[in-house]
Amino acid sequence: RPRSDDSLQTLSRLLEDEYGHYLPSDELNNEAEEMSPAASLPELNADQSDLELPWERESREIGGRPFRQEAVLARLLKDLSNNPLRFRGRSKKGPSRGCFGVKLDRIGAMSGLGC
């Protein structure tokens, strides 16, 4: 449904009251006249595609070489396969670990109770 000019003026006045201290009113009016939302989006996307942020450039070059995520993932998987993980489960004759751990009782039964 079409909006009346009264409702648009009311909305504009409310927004100026709420956010007017961030921008002077003459800047608000100039920006509103210069930009339409549909026209500004393609320009914004085109401008941002050419920008390169410093941390993006640094993340691609580590140690003077181009950074490739596939190579890092392959190296990580290779390291995991070459180094077996130690199983830290309970063993029947493991050492007493004291409070809040596994403790060997007098009769040789394992328990996880206190000190």
Swiss-Prot record:
> Where do the segments described as Disordered lie?
24-49
Entry coiled-coil feature ranges: none
> InterPro entries given for it?
C_natriurtcpep (IPR002406), Natr_peptide (IPR000663), Natr_peptide_CS (IPR030480)
Compartments where found: Secreted
Gene Ontology MF terms in the entry: hormone activity
Q: Does the keyword Disulfide bond apply?
A: yes
Keywords for this entry?
Cleavage on pair of basic residues, Disulfide bond, Hormone, Secreted, Vasoactive
Output the superkingdom of the source species. Answer: Eukaryota
Identify the stretch annotated as signal peptide in this record: none
A GO cellular component annotation in the UniProt record: extracellular region
From the record, give the cysteines joined by S-S bonds.
Answer: C99-C115
What family is this?
Answer: Belongs to the natriuretic peptide family.
Protein name, as recorded: C-type natriuretic peptide prohormone
Upper lineage is: Eukaryota, Metazoa, Chordata, Craniata, Vertebrata
